[in-house]
């Protein structure tokens, strides 16, 4: 719709007013939220057969081997521990095998002089 007014008698300015009508419809936007189950935190759970790590209340699941404390030169390893405690299980993830009496490899040969594991 448009309106205009004509010239005034005194020779004044002409003014016009323009009005526009539009059919504006509100936009209908939809928002979809997808809820996802939160991932659980990674946990380590110990079973009753997990070996205590050096009697300190800590537990280890990396290997079935038991750490052997370095001994002074000449001390026999059989004096304080059984030879049956070495890695003979088939589930050892590091591939350790029990040393046979015919081989020169001992269960502690996987360790260097500082007592850490060598692989």
UniProtKB/Swiss-Prot annotation:
Its EC number is 2.3.2.27. Pathway: Protein modification; protein ubiquitination. It holds the Pfam family PPI_Ypi1. GO terms for biological process: defense response to Gram-positive bacterium; negative regulation of cytokine production; protein ubiquitination; ubiquitin-dependent protein catabolic process. Signal peptide: none annotated. The keyword Transferase applies. Residues 1-42, 96-119 are annotated as: Disordered. It catalyses: S-ubiquitinyl-[E2 ubiquitin-conjugating enzyme]-L-cysteine + [acceptor protein]-L-lysine = [E2 ubiquitin-conjugating enzyme]-L-cysteine + N(6)-ubiquitinyl-[acceptor protein]-L-lysine. The keyword Transferase applies. Residues 55-65 are annotated as: Atypical RING finger domain 1. InterPro entries: PPI_Ypi1 (IPR011107). Residues 107-119 have a biased composition (Basic and acidic residues). Keywords: Protein phosphatase inhibitor, Transferase, Ubl conjugation pathway. Atypical E3 ubiquitin-protein ligase which ubiquitinates TLR2 at 'Lys-754' leading to its degradation by the proteasome. Inhibitor of protein phosphatase 1. This is E3 ubiquitin-protein ligase PPP1R11. It comes from Xenopus tropicalis. The lineage of its organism: Eukaryota, Metazoa, Chordata, Craniata, Vertebrata. The gene is ppp1r11.
């Amino acid at each position: 719709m448009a309106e205009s007014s004509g010239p005034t008698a005194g020779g004044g300015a002409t003014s016009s007013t323009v009005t526009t009508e539009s059919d504006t419809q509100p936009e209908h936007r939809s928002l979809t939220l997808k809820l996802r189950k939160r991932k659980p935190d990674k946990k380590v759970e110990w079973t009753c057969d997990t070996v205590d790590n050096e009697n300190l209340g800590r537990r280890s699941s990396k290997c079935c081997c038991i750490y052997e404390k370095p001994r002074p030169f000449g001390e026999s390893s059989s004096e304080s521990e059984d030879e049956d405690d070495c890695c003979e299980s088939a589930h050892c993830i590091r591939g350790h095998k029990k040393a046979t009496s015919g081989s020169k490899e001992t269960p502690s040969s996987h360790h260097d002089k500082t007592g850490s594991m060598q692989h």
